[in-house]
């Protein structure tokens, strides 16, 4: 899995929740940071992306000081609900520090 050396744990997403092979779609030109809409550990997020039929994933997940990786950077994670953006982006899901209605994210 190609990615950051800052990762503390790697958990491969289910193959049906991302697209294998980014090179035919162009280079990485953006980073997307998205919140989980929940208070989740990197293991919780990894299990979510391993769920058959989830149809979603991220390259990385951050919870506290832990960084998880779920999809290789040479593959396309399904994070943005926008195909062209997904093709260009490395995506990072962050755990929330609280819930609705404000969904805060801690530093």
Question: Model segments located where?
Answer:
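Active-site-adjacent loop/helix surface patches within enzyme catalytic domains
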Residues: 1-107
């Amino acid at each position: 899995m190609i990615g950051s050396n800052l990762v503390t744990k790697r958990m491969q997403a289910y193959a049906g929740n991302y697209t294998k092979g980014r090179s035919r779609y162009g280079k990485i030109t953006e980073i997307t940071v998205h919140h989980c809409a929940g208070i989740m550990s990197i293991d919780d997020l990894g299990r979510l992306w391993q769920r058959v039929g989830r149809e979603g994933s991220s390259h990385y997940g951050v919870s506290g000081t832990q960084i998880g990786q779920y999809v290789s950077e040479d593959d396309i994670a399904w994070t943005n609900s926008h195909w062209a953006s997904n093709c260009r982006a490395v995506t990072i899901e962050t755990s929330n520090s609280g819930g609705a209605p404000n969904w805060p994210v801690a530093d």
